[in-house]
């Protein structure tokens, strides 16, 4: 019972923080088609760039203060730790920590092997993120 309350608190905290999370876009991403395709952050380096100068009314510049809290960093939205699996040996390791982890199958696994691992994980009672 206590574990569920703890996980629920973590889930609520994750939800609140991810709602507030700012999406850092490249300066002028909306003005040019080729830049608009690159919606990833690039450090502004121009001499008069308002983002670099951190002028009011422009998008925020990436800073260390925007980082998510350590206790929720890297967690799955369910509040569990993602555990990447490539083979049955990894599944056995995950089953030892099944209260804390959620299984994520590696993208390099083929369909046949993935189906076998999904079946095995269900027998072990593991939670699966992408099965």
From Swiss-Prot:
UniProt entry keywords in alphabetical sequence: Ribonucleoprotein, Ribosomal protein
Family, according to the entry, reads as follows: Belongs to the eukaryotic ribosomal protein eL32 family.
Signal sequence: where? none
Q: Which SMART domains match?
A: Ribosomal_L32e (SM01393)
Q: What species was this sequence derived from?
A: Sulfurisphaera tokodaii (strain DSM 16993 / JCM 10545 / NBRC 100140 / 7) (Sulfolobus tokodaii)
Q: Which residues cross the membrane?
A: none
| Entries under InterPro entries matching the protein | Ribosomal_eL32, Ribosomal_eL32_arc, Ribosomal_eL32_CS, Ribosomal_eL32_sf
For this protein, the record's SUPFAM superfamilies field holds: Ribosomal protein L32e
PANTHER family listed in its UniProt record: 60S RIBOSOMAL PROTEIN L32 AND DNA-DIRECTED RNA POLYMERASE II, SUBUNIT N (PTHR23413), RIBOSOMAL PROTEIN L32 (PTHR23413:SF1)
Tell me which CDD domains the record gives: Ribosomal_L32_L32e (cd00513)
A Gene Ontology annotation in the biological process aspect, one of them, is: translation
> A single GO molecular function, which one?
structural constituent of ribosome
Instruction: Cite a GO CC annotation.
Output: cytosolic large ribosomal subunit
- Protein name as it appears in the record: Large ribosomal subunit protein eL32
| Highest taxon in the source lineage | Archaea
